[in-house]
Amino acid sequence: MPELNNFTYERLQKLVAVVFIGCIMVLFLSGFDTIKSKSRDVKRRADVKILVKALDMYHDKYGKYPDSHNDWQGWDLSIGYNGGKVDFIDRLKAEGFIDREIKDPINDVAYHYRYQKFQAGDYGCQTSFYILQIAGFELPSENNGQGECPELNWVKSATNGYTVQDFD
């Protein structure tokens, strides 16, 4: 009889060890997903800084920001549209203002970059301007950028994203 109790005790110890290791793995893996999401959000911010610099160089060379070509409701999207190319990013690359294709790390309907050039008078802004947005971050963000006309606050159109606005 003592052998049976000893056997059961050893099995119980092993079971506790396996459960403990399983719990640690679950905690590690859930934290790992957060780390991956954070790194993708950091890349998104870095990409937008590169795109803003490239847009400024384009403006310096041509005296205006590039036009958007209405991939989707006036926006040029980093996901393209119906398999189309991303016009403003392609133009910046072709002109040598960026040296690689820039796209969101996930680059789908929820997570992408979008750009639109607006004319003077649109939404009450007196001069032409562009809006560049990160459509969404994976983690909540306190800094959502800036972009506003008298008739529309662009930051509110990408509530957990990031907005950049600049005027011609």
Model-inferred region functions:
Residues Y9-A46:
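Amphipathic alpha-helical segments typified by the pilin-like N-terminal helix
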Residues D56, D60-G136:
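Extracellular/periplasmic head regions of type IV pilus-like filament subunits
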Residues F32-I35, D47-Y65:
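N-terminal alpha-helical signal peptides/signal-anchor transmembrane segments
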Residues M1-F7:
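N-terminal Lys/Arg-rich, disordered targeting/topogenic segments
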Residues P2, Y123-D168:
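Short, surface-exposed interaction loops/tails
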